[in-house]
């Protein structure tokens, strides 16, 4: 498992980011919350990660805090909630707002 990645942002959209580290570009799917909390293209960033492997894809998910990452893991443990739904939930509110 990859716990976190630290590198330079080379591409960024509201739900996806590319981080370059040691000449390799890593694509990470992110929530809108994470997108708002990190820098812009050219900035250094540290994202906590979850690697999900399925029959169709290998996807790396990135989070601006380990707290958000752990909450994502909690969400996807709920039956019927997959990674995409969990990211949408995290995009709508902060972890603190969801808990309250």
What residue spans do the PLM features occupy?
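Long, highly charged, low-complexity intrinsically disordered interaction regions
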Residues: 4-6, 10-100
């Amino acid at each position: 498992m990859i716990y976190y990645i630290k590198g330079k942002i080379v591409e960024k959209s509201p739900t996806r980011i590319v981080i370059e580290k040691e000449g390799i570009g890593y694509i990470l799917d992110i929530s809108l919350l994470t997108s708002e909390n990190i820098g812009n293209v050219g900035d250094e960033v540290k994202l906590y990660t979850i690697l999900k492997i399925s029959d169709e894809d290998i996807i790396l998910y990135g989070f601006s805090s380990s707290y958000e990452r752990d909450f994502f893991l909690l969400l996807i443990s709920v039956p019927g909630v997959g990674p995409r739904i969990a990211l949408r939930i995290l995009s709508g509110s902060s972890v603190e707002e969801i808990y309250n």
